Amino acid sequence: MIVFKNKVISLEDEQYSLYLLNKPKGYICSNAQDNKNRVIDLIKSNSRLYTIGRLDVNTTGAILVTNDGDLANKLLHPRYDKEKKYLVRTFIDIPKDKYIKLKKGLNIGKRQKAKGVIKRIKKENKHIYWEVILTEGKNREVRRIFKELGSAVIDL
């Protein structure tokens, strides 16, 4: 609402949208104009859109997209301590004594520690499926965790 000299000039209700999108490989979660294949370009909207979460270009999966910047901030900013859940597929089975180290913190790079929970879900044919729960989700964090544990990620 805009008021000028005690008179209402315009009254607009903000309309917020929230989309659940199955992000395909080859698309990035960025608003930068110079990037090709942005997730937000898959949705026709006249509003500025924000991805809630970051999945790297080679990752597929559910991602939320909204035009509500406050909601995006509350779900993304580390101070709100929101969990992010990932399903990971690997070829290599990792011993439990290795992957439980993530609870206390696992070194994944230069002065970077990842904290979270990994749970082995099932083994199917040659593949092992894992559930990973993190509260941050830094740049390629899940892939770096599995690399540190001695396994490459097939699908994320």
Where are these regions (language model features)?
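Basic, flexible Lys/Arg- and Gly-enriched helix-loop patches that mediate nucleic-acid binding at interfaces
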Residues: 1-156
